[in-house]
Structure formats: C-alpha cells, structure tokens
C-alpha cells in the first residue's frame, strides 16, 4: 500500500481509488493523501465519500490518506476534520482514526484541537438512537482507543474530558472510557483519575486489661442444733 502511494502518479491513484477491486481501491485511496495538498477540495470531497464505503479496507485507506496529509500539513488536516466531526459515524470514525496517530501529536496545540474533535464525536455517540447499525459499532470501536492516543500526548489537557465523560450514564460512552483507561499508555492519567484512598493511621495497641481477682469462697458456718432435755 505504501509503495503504490509513493510510486503511482495521481491519475493512477484516482483510478485505483474508484476500482471495484477492494485491494486496488485501498491502495489508491491511501495514496490520495499525496495528492490532497495539490487538489485539496476535490480530494477531500472524494475521501469523505470513501470514508462511508461499505468495504472496510477502503475506509481504512481513508484513514491512511488523512495521516499522510497530517504529516505534510497538520493545520490543513485539522481544519478539514473539524468539519468531518459533524458528519455521520463512518466519516467521524475516519476523522478520529486519521488524527489519532502518535507522530501527528507532537505539538500540544494540535493535540488540544484533536481532543476537541473527539469530544464532539463522543457527544454525538451518546446521542445516537440506532445503535445496532454497523456504522455506530465501527465508530464506538475506534473511540475505544483513539482517546488514549490523544490523551497520552497531552494528559493534562485530556484529564477534564475524561472526568466529564467518565460521569456519563450512557453505557457505550462508559465502555469507550473504560477501554481507553485500560491501555498501558494511560497509566499516568489513570492514577490521576483514580479516587485517592484515605491513609489509615497505625492502630494503637490496646492496653492490657488486668485480670480481676477471683472472689474468695465464703467459709461455711456450721449450725448447731440444740436438743431439749
């Protein structure tokens, strides 16, 4: 996939991205990230359409293309993803997966915007009505790891969002937060979010109780019976 994106010209990438063959479509879609800065409007419109493709490999190709765009121009990618965050679940999933790549989150300012986008997407997840559809499940799964990638890059900025969503009564949002907190990269933030347990002082030794003296047995008194003469 990477080789095709690097070697193929833009015409071939366009053709591949529209192919009925899933692998060719994956390669062409992923490679369009190289063309995006030269033809931004056309490419981003097409990628947004492909983000909702029924084939999961093509949808994955969109995320790869977005990451490639981000490596060239993170401000351009962020501007587009703010728009995608208001789209349907498949497109939102592409935005989250495209942004939450560790090497794209080296600057705090970028990560702060990514957290804002994830917050918007999570808000729409909590308001979803039909949760049995595939697009909802795909978005839920992506959010189950994307938050932790962004949070690991900027834990202090992420903490208020986690505190907010950890208090949600929505079962799917609760799963998303729990899944992210279970990641090894979340160890530091997980400790901050855990309720602190009060320290227990050392128990003072109980004073030894003195044994009570046993009561002395009373001496029996003999009663004499007088005999009448």
Regions found by a protein language model. Give the residues of each.
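Alpha-helical scaffold domains
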Residues: 1-216, 226-229
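Long, intrinsically disordered low-complexity tandem-repeat segments
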Residues: 221-225
């Amino acid at each position: 996939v990477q080789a095709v994106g690097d070697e193929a010209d833009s015409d071939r990438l366009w053709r591949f991205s529209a192919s009925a063959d899933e692998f060719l479509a994956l390669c062409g879609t992923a490679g369009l990230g190289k063309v995006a800065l030269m033809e931004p409007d056309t490419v981003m419109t097409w990628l947004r359409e492909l983000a909702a493709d029924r084939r999961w490999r093509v949808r994955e190709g969109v995320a790869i293309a977005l990451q490639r765009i981000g490596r060239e121009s993170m401000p351009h990618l962020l501007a587009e993803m703010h728009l995608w965050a208001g789209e349907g679940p498949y497109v939102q999933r592409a935005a989250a997966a495209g942004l939450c790549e560790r090497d794209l989150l080296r600057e705090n300012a970028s990560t702060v915007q990514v957290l804002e986008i994830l917050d918007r997407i999570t808000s729409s997840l909590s308001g979803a009505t039909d949760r049995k559809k595939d697009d909802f499940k795909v978005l839920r799964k992506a959010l189950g790891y994307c938050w932790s990638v962004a949070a690991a890059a900027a834990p202090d900025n992420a903490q208020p969002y986690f505190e907010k969503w950890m208090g949600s009564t929505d079962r799917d949002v609760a799963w998303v937060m729990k899944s992210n907190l279970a990641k090894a990269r979340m160890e530091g933030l997980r400790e901050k979010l855990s309720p602190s347990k009060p320290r227990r002082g050392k128990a003072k030794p109980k004073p030894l109780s003195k044994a009570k003296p046993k009561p002395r047995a009373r001496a029996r008194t003999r009663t004499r019976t007088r005999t009448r003469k």
